[in-house]
Amino acid sequence: NSGIHVAVDTCGYTTSSKALEVLKAADLLLFDIKGIDPMRHKKNTGKSNEVILQNLHLLSEMRKPMIIRVPVIPGYNDSDEELNGIADLLSTLKSVERVDILPEHEFGRIKYEQLDLEYRLKPCPVSAERQDAIRVMFEAKGFHTQIGG
């Protein structure tokens, strides 16, 4: 109510009522979707995506403005099948303002090093041509899409 625009960057993985209240109160959500295949999601992240997808649908029903961010991870979610599945999922939502295609990066490496953990992702950049093809794929499904975010 103080005139400050609040944006929250989230992967949507929460069952906390307090965290959900924060998401509901935000003016804009930057919501990361890494994949829709539940088995692959659990194998690669250690967690099911069930809660993530439930929260995504809940916030969509509330017409909460969202920028969906899709980190493209080679060997995990970079297939046409998985990306089309993500786009089809997003087509069911009511408040997607834009889709950001996020090419693979190593920004998380420092966090792992600080926690004395092994950073298991190996550098595998997504070519500019592939990034553009993914952008076109999402735009063909009606989404305003950009590379980067």
Tell me the role of every PLM-derived stretch.
Residues 130-149:
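A cross-taxonomic marker for long C-terminal extensions/tails that follow the last structured domain
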